């Protein structure tokens, strides 16, 4: 893929606009059907248990996570918990899934890690975090399935889901450092086969995390710690 400048890429993006037991945290109370087939959602979420046992460069081993999937309309399809993940990370995982879906299109994939630098003061997307606020009605555990909770998070852990080169939704992970959350989400999506034919801002043409050596610029993300890895 021929390298593109950050400004050119942004123009494209904005134009299109056991201890390892998995617990389902939804009761199906919503009235909007998920636009992703149930089998596909299940295939994504089933990857969490295996990925959590890998070295993901985070604070916990095995990982303790919330994992959320939204469809292209932002409808919450599924949110699950692995281990004693931080309760506050439930809403964050949903918001990450929403962000990755909301700001990716068929021309350009942007993970939430890619959005870190552009949304800092002076960045071309500064203020984005004030858009699409999370609906507090869905903060409670067990709520939000079949609804559109919204939310914007611009640090690692959210990736768009692609099928045949088209965005079908987003996946959000939260429960560790933002860098580890990204690794887990990225690996889950790859194992589920929903990372095909996407076009991203990383040098390899993906939406992988781009670590900054100094102050993050372009589509970079700061390091979270000495154990950080690139999946």
Model-derived regions, located:
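Bacterial N-terminal signal peptides that target proteins for export
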Residues: 1-9
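Long, compositionally biased tandem-repeat segments
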Residues: 13-14
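Flexible, solvent-exposed loop/hinge segments and secondary-structure transition points
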Residues: 24-231
């Amino acid at each position: 893929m021929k390298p593109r400048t950050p400004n050119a890429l942004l123009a494209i993006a904005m134009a299109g606009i056991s201890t390892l037991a998995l617990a389902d945290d939804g009761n199906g109370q919503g009235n909007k059907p998920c636009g992703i087939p149930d089998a596909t959602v299940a295939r994504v979420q089933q990857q969490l248990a295996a990925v959590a046992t890998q070295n993901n460069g985070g604070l916990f081993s095995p990982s303790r996570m919330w994992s959320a999937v939204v469809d292209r309309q932002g409808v919450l399809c599924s949110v699950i918990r692995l281990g004693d993940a931080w309760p506050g990370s439930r809403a964050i995982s949903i918001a990450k899934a929403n962000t990755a879906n909301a700001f990716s299109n068929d021309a350009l994939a942007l993970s939430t890690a890619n959005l870190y630098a552009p949304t800092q003061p002076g960045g071309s997307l500064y203020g984005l975090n004030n858009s699409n606020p999370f609906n507090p009605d869905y903060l409670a555990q067990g709520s939000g399935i079949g609804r559109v909770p919204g939310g914007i998070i611009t640090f690692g852990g959210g990736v768009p889901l692609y099928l045949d080169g088209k965005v079908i939704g987003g996946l959000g992970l939260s429960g560790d450092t933002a860098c580890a959350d990204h690794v887990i989400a990225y690996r889950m999506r790859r194992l589920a086969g929903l990372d095909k034919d996407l076009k991203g801002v990383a040098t390899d043409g993906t939406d992988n995390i781009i670590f900054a050596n100094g102050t993050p610029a372009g589509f970079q993300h700061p390091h979270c710690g000495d154990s950080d890895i690139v999946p």
